[in-house]
Amino acid sequence: MRQNVLFEFGTPIVRVLNALDALSNGRGILVVDDENRENEGDMIFAAENMTVKQMALAIRYGSGIVCLCLTEEKCRQLKLPMMVKNNSNHYKTAFTVTIEASKGITTGVSAKDRLTTIKTSIEDYAKPSDLNRPGHVFPLRAHNGGVLSRSGHTEAAVDLTTLAGLKPFGVICEVTNEDGSMARTTEIIKFSKQYDMPVLTISDVIAYRMSNL
């Protein structure tokens, strides 16, 4: 059903290629997961080239929970422990403790401050002391193996930024409707046309990666 709705965006492989082009050129993308999973759409931006304007868009039209998708290696580098010892989340979403840049911000909640925290985190030689805990940015630890090991938005963000030739870190936020409900595929498509963001599915990313093994 969803594949028929997304046909206007091309085949699964074309949708991925369009997303990679968008990310490499500093645009956001929209990724929807399985209809039998969360059935939600996330805005995804490459952390490396995300702008304050894009962060403001994510905060305004998203859930407000802005997440930074990191590799396991980066989480170790920053010494970010998991938020809880025993993860009972149904989808095993791997939240670490929340973070804030230790310098260059005020309250940490503005679009500019959140982006400063993200840019600080993804610096090649970032240190644990560069971040305060807790904060207003929610890091997520991606599984090694990406979407081939876990079909989540976290892994899709890391896979897509990597495939786009960028640092393997993505910023994600769920898209919501004006009434606060979660946007589904129809609303996601409308949003994509309004903000010029290509749409694809996590299944598309899996298919693309499988075709390149």
From Swiss-Prot:
Top-level EC class as recorded in UniProt: lyase
Residues annotated to bind Mg(2+) 1: 38
Ligand binding (D-ribulose 5-phosphate): 37-38, 42, 150-154, 174
Domain of life: Bacteria
Statement: the UniProt record of this protein carries the keyword Protein biosynthesis: no
GO biological process terms held by the UniProt record: riboflavin biosynthetic process
Catalytic activity, as annotated: D-ribulose 5-phosphate = (2S)-2-hydroxy-3-oxobutyl phosphate + formate + H(+)
The enzyme's E.C. designation: 4.1.99.12
Keywords: Lyase, Magnesium, Manganese, Metal-binding, Riboflavin biosynthesis
Cofactor: Mg(2+); Mn(2+)
Record-level GO cellular component terms: cytosol
Cofactor note: Binds 2 divalent metal cations per subunit. Magnesium or manganese.
Gene Ontology molecular function: 3,4-dihydroxy-2-butanone-4-phosphate synthase activity; magnesium ion binding; manganese ion binding
Residue positions binding Mg(2+) 2: 38, 153
Pathway: Cofactor biosynthesis; riboflavin biosynthesis; 2-hydroxy-3-oxobutyl phosphate from D-ribulose 5-phosphate: step 1/1
Pfam families: DHBP_synthase (PF00926)
InterPro entries linked to this entry: DHBP_synth_RibB-like_a/b_dom (IPR017945), DHBP_synthase_RibB (IPR000422)
Site (Essential for catalytic activity): 136, 174
Assembly mode: Homodimer.
Family: Belongs to the DHBP synthase family.
PANTHER family: 3,4-DIHYDROXY-2-BUTANONE 4-PHOSPHATE SYNTHASE, GTP CYCLOHYDROLASE II-RELATED
Function: Catalyzes the conversion of D-ribulose 5-phosphate to formate and 3,4-dihydroxy-2-butanone 4-phosphate.
Official protein name in the record: 3,4-dihydroxy-2-butanone 4-phosphate synthase
Name of the gene this protein is made from: ribB
